[in-house]
Structures are given as C-alpha cells and as structure tokens.
C-alpha cells in the first residue's frame, strides 16, 4: 500500500494542510507542490530597503509582511522613497511587469522646493540627460503650490535606477520627499504606512492591461 510522507513522517490525515515549505513524498517519490499565486501591496515606510534579506541587519520590506509564500518584490523603491510596492510569488507576472518593453506606468508624488517651469516640463517629456549615458523621462500629471514648495504628481514608464532623484538633481530642484502612489492600474489609496493587503483576482488581472 502506498504511503504519504510529510517532512519525513507518515501522514494518514487526508485533511492535513500542506504548505509550500513542506517536503512531501508519495510512494517514495517526491511530490512537486503547486503554490497558489498571490500578490501583495505594501505601503513601504521610509528607511526600509527593498530586498528579501539584509546581511547588515537593516529593516527590509519582508519585515512588514506575514505570509507563508516565498515572495519577491516587483521592482524596487530606494530607502528614502515610500509608498506602493508589489510583492509576489508569481514569476511570470514578475517578469511581465519588470520587462522594459512593457513600459509599465508608475505614478509618484514629490514634494519639491519651488516649482517645475513649463520649459522644464517640456524637457522632461522629451527626456533629459541624467548621467551614465541615460536619459530620464517623466510626465507631469499635476502640480500644486504649497507656500514656496510644490506637490508634483509624475508618471514614469522607464524605471531607471533612482530616475526621479537624478532628474531633479539635473534640474537643480531640491527634492524633499518622494512617494509612489500608483503602479499600472493600481492606486495606493488609503493603505497606511507599514501596512499591506492581498490583491484580489480582478486587481491582478488589471496588471496585464497596461
């Protein structure tokens, strides 16, 4: 009679809840477990690094998510940038969203000293040199003046490393804070800093409609 072993022990309970981390054998042969595909949205706090683990003991985005799944961040936000970050165990979705050819829209809210002029806005739309043989592009969606400062909503599609910070450096504009508020068809909404939620199937499907 064939037996089932879970983590080296015979299992006779048909209702036993197997997790992706369990080692399962049936009749002496290893069983490959098929994981459910999940996507989480995290509102990343400041001074948290976008990585699965850190050898220097710094806080990572994984410290804020309690999940049995092996998750990978989709793209990254630098330490100082807060806001919307997606994490998933779905390799196909991860590849789709991070592939440069898909030009996924990412919306940010920046607080800056002064304001972006009409001429600078036009330059950003065409693309400006940001160093290392790269050009940064951004679409200014909205700009509001706040007592000598401005709150600017920008949309990026290229995803170059620290692109917005490099753009403002080239424009000689001081960047006070930066928060990602949208990714593809998703919005951060009222998700609090340091909190996360699981996306529903409708939201996951919307990520393919870019």
Language-model segments: residues:
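Basic, flexible Lys/Arg- and Gly-enriched helix-loop patches that mediate nucleic-acid binding at interfaces
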Residues: 1-210
């Amino acid at each position: 009679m064939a037996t089932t072993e879970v983590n080296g022990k015979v299992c006779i309970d048909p209702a036993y809840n197997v997790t992706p981390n369990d080692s399962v054998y049936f009749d002496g042969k290893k069983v490959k477990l098929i994981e459910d595909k999940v996507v989480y949205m995290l509102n990343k706090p400041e001074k948290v690094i976008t990585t699965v683990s850190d050898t220097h003991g710094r806080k990572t985005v994984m410290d804020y998510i309690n999940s049995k799944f092996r998750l990978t961040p989709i793209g990254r936000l630098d330490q100082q940038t807060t806001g919307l970050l997606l994490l998933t165990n779905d390799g196909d979705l991860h590849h789709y969203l991070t592939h440069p050819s898909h030009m996924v829209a990412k919306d940010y809210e920046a607080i800056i000293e002064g304001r972006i002029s009409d001429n600078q806005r036009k330059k950003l739309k065409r693309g400006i040199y940001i160093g290392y043989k790269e050009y940064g592009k951004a679409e200014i969606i909205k700009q509001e003046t706040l007592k000598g400062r401005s709150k600017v909503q920008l949309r990026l599609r290229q995803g170059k490393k620290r692109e917005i910070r490099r753009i403002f450096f080239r424009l000689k504009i001081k960047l006070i804070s930066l928060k990602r508020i949208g990714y593809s068809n998703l919005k951060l909404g009222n998700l609090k800093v340091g909190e996360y939620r699981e996306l529903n199937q409708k939201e996951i499907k919307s990520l393919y409609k870019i």
